[in-house]
From Swiss-Prot:
This is Ribosomal RNA small subunit methyltransferase A. It comes from Nocardia farcinica (strain IFM 10152). Specifically dimethylates two adjacent adenosines (A1518 and A1519) in the loop of a conserved hairpin near the 3'-end of 16S rRNA in the 30S particle. May play a critical role in biogenesis of 30S subunits. Keywords: Cytoplasm, Methyltransferase, RNA-binding, rRNA processing, S-adenosyl-L-methionine, Transferase. The keyword Transit peptide does not apply. GO terms for cellular component: cytosol. It comes from the Bacteria. It catalyses: adenosine(1518)/adenosine(1519) in 16S rRNA + 4 S-adenosyl-L-methionine = N(6)-dimethyladenosine(1518)/N(6)-dimethyladenosine(1519) in 16S rRNA + 4 S-adenosyl-L-homocysteine + 4 H(+). S-adenosyl-L-methionine binds at residues 38, 40, 65, 86, 116, 135.
Amino acid sequence: MSEADVTARGDAALLGPAEVRALAERFGVRPTKQLGQNFVHDANTVRRIVTAAGVGRADTVLEVGPGLGSLTLALLDVVDSVVAVEIDPVLAEHLPRTVADRAPALAGRLRVVRDDALRVRAADLPASPTALVANLPYNVAVPVLLHLLAELPGLRTALVMVQAEVADRLAAEPGSRVYGVPSVKAGFFGTVRRAGAVGTQVFWPVPRVESGLVRVERYVEPPWPMDEQHRRRVFEIIDAAFAQRRKTLRAALAGWAGSPAEAERRLLAAGIDPTARGETLDTAAYVRLAAQA
């Protein structure tokens, strides 16, 4: 969907710095590092996130870690259904009230699920989401993203804000310095690219690191099987290859294959140089290798 197709209704009163702090004080909320809580307080930033997500009224958007509701309100201006998953019981309780106060005409479009995004299943959600749009808790951003892409096959896109370094890793190309496990595993589900940068001053409390936007477009026609059993086989090989990053694949995959010789045989059968290192292979190569097990 093009940016021109995204038309905000403008019914929500978005949160600014004063409103964010006032809500936190009213609810007795103190952001914790344990939950990776940094609340966005800049209206232009949340509008930019929604625009970059490319969502429209027909989408059901999954938001993880809505916090005080900054991004939630901006999403409700554009889509007719938002499912917000929040682990913090206080924030989960107050989010519907905040939306009712600041966007009364849109409050019926929000459903809140109090749960851990690392454990949530499709059956736990009141609707099947088509898009993930979230300021992910930075301490668990990659596991949450991969879990949701695996658990919710109806997600056609994901637009997430993560630590800038993590954004670079997710969108990295084979052979680059930061290419690693997150890059390969995210590439199993779809195409991944950086979608922008976000500075520190739009958050409260101000984080020590810059943030980045990452967009995942799920494959319309998957180039390989997407079932859980196949995914686990592929991910097992990825983990083994990067556990000993500086070793050749022949050596790094010896434990997985049973011996260096068997690892070499499987690598050659998959059309992969046994002396290569894991950081040089794209996701498709790992999928080919899994077929040799």
